[in-house]
């Protein structure tokens, strides 16, 4: 089996089209037999070669690659040598090296070289309907960087070839093949885009380093390690496009492939660019050439796909890719190359000097007011930012006050330009200044002025810049703002300063204890809330599905007014005699059944649980407590001692003091007893309490959430609390219901969680919802139990029950009643749960939907039989949901449950937006 004697490299322009060699499955199996392999062959898609997966029973032995007859022996040898070279240089990178061959074999139309390559399990990133996360995109860039570094020292005669995929020839390829594009409009746009991109690359060409390049480090050829539900790029296959070309082309080809994926847009490639740059630093010239090369690659893919389909119409791999290539091209063209280049340079720290600040006032505006439209502006309070025409009304009001002009701020992210329930960021960042003037103003040449009437937009673009819109999306702001200068100095206004949002996280890490964690690795900066929405400083508005603290909704005007009014009058400690503490205590006790009639007021849930336990210890004289596993109750010594959730404290079980005794979490979905067997949980708890009493250690209390909140809102088994409460009371103990998460109407049907169980506890703890974000908690018990606390001394909390805290508590109860929030929780919660249960029918990852009202949980499992928790997938889903405009977080000890605890003002539109976003994520990936 000798190699082909032909040594010259292929020349695409001489060969024209390269149809895939027609090889049947039987022929492929016969070729494999030449290498001593008895296998079953399965065809794989390819653009120019004929590929087959070779298997022996259930074992994959390799991939048979029969090269296009146009490729010489030297080219094939170079490919195998390059693969071996990379494998040696990058031991952590899996590489499809040759295991057998090459050998010359007959094919339809001539003879070709065949060999068997190592099979890399795990699958590729391919699939245009599949979403690629920033982590995966960065992994793609890292693979491209590793390959580029390794090949920088590789040389071989077989690199001397002229390929249509070599970006040095991109414009020539487009010109040669554009005639195959039947859609005239598309053809014209592709050729124009290629010409414009080439005009940007050509002046840089002399500064772009050459080397050996793989040429096809794309989603089709990067293989992933699949571990714990997540993909990590760690392998490379298919060296068929190996050649010598611009080194930066390796990255351009890689990131172009990202654009065909679900949800991708130009800024989606930045993690790959950064990862590549970290391994193989790009020069400023390479960074400047990168996006034009992406456009050229996209244009080549479109024309090549159309040409290949024309000459190889039976190739499903080719014809199926046409629509994806067109979509990829449209996305590459959706942002001007100048903007993407500026964005890339800024991301890599390669941007040149900022545009010079213009000097000298050229327009005298007189007395001018500056209008703040950011998320932190008082002008957008109480949801005013959602009102159409707010900017004009604010400006006209200032003009009416006597100002000669009103101006907005350059580079500011305007909350007034945002919108709610949006799956992508709107254009919020100003590229100029809007002006309202009391009298007409003459503007000199050099300023770009648009608009009519007494409102105009003034900008100062650089020469030859593309048309700059007045507002741009925050993801692209650095690119757009590199094309415009701040016109403020020319208008006699102060120059705007743009904060570095990353600096805030650094300052937090330096001054704020790191154990006080924040949501998300790269969190948005949230500075405003309204109802069930949270607004970031870049103008993006998120649907808040996790913030059960703001039970009424964020920034409720009645709470704000009540606090301000009371602060103007009095705020002191609860030892003084004032009405609000009495009124709130009466109202709260009035919501509970007898004999729960006496209230203690504290500042938090942790304090409430701590006090409840102290009450039980003093009232009973007992020293032990029974608590439920996988629960969280607080951070004080006592409340932490009974917190058994390993998600909140990995050492919770090992460090539990001897006076705390844990019973199994009554989880009817994945616990020891499931379904109808779940009634046995209460028997086990009763047995433990009896055993403790038999050893002379009867418990002072049994503490549990009456609705299993930490598991994602799961009801306890029927009769569970009735049986356990009866047993603990039989031995002189108290029943404590922790309502901090689940109470206050959140469950919809029941105001208190214990109502679902048909029981009355001896002590109830509440917090979170009681203050709608203001620090307020309470313990409610009977007069007899409360009086026993005197045996341990007196109780006092400086700000617990303060005038302001008490007024807040009263206002929250008023709003819950006046706005029908419990009924809303029942209605919207039922709608949302039905939507989620419908998703569970279509998406196997959803194992169960738990909960009631607006305390719901979606539990993700990898297998509905074994219930293996999908922990990593859940966190990745939360990250993707954030990108789509939803704030959601995981819960449970396995961190595989989405905890759905939004403000009770959530409406059906918000519920549907959440369900639709989750459906999209589960369909497209995370």
For the regions a language model picked out, list residue spans one by one.
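An alpha-helical support segment within catalytic cores of ATP-dependent transferases
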Residues: 21-32, 153-156, 172-215, 225-228, ...
